[in-house]
Amino acid sequence: MQKCIMRSTEFKTHFSFHSIFSFPLSAALLALISASEPASKAFINVQFISSPLVKKEVLPFIVSFHSLSSNGILSFSPFTSSNLSIAQLPFLIKVPLLSMGSLALENFNKFIPRADLVAAWVTIIMVFTFGNFLSTLSIKTGQNLWHLSKISSSVSPLLLGIILGSQSGEIMLGKNLLITS
């Protein structure tokens, strides 16, 4: 059984983040969370303790979110500090609904049904669109609506849980991860 260990990181908002989703799902969800504090920058350092597939070497994967403007529009860019080339690394991510901050990456040899991935993307797009709508409305009206945006970003993982949740109270995300150096 393969596992992923992620070093816990703190946002400048003092929000302790202990979970990671499949990329780019991770980028979308983390951007939503980061958008609740548009002036902040979040740096997430993820280390995959690799399987025999990558010869037990450690693959650091750093995702940084840079605040572009005060309305919370963010961009992200991935950086890999390894010369490894991994083709179609399948993985199964289980996120306990009662503990959204924890994650175990297990069972590299399992795939997630495409329907689950589509449902996850639909949810993310809906919440992300709502966040952008709040940003635009805040600029036009001059009112601070970031508390609503923060609520929407907090609800995003819960919506994913409701849509993708299994009877065991866990959601499964991800399909294939392609990283090339």
From Swiss-Prot:
Transmembrane helix is among the record's keywords: yes
Membrane topology: Multi-pass membrane protein
Parts of the chain on the Extracellular side: 36-58, 106-116, 175-181
Superkingdom of the source species: Eukaryota
Keyword Protease part of the UniProt annotation: no
Entry keywords, A to Z: Membrane, Transmembrane, Transmembrane helix
Positions in the Cytoplasmic compartment: 1-14, 80-84, 138-153
Location(s) in or outside the cell: Membrane
UniProt GO cellular component terms: membrane
TM region(s), chain numbering: 15-35, 59-79, 85-105, 117-137, 154-174
Any further remark recorded for this protein: Partially overlaps YNL108c.
UniProt name for this protein: Putative uncharacterized membrane protein YNL109W
Lineage summary: Eukaryota, Fungi, Dikarya, Ascomycota, Saccharomycotina
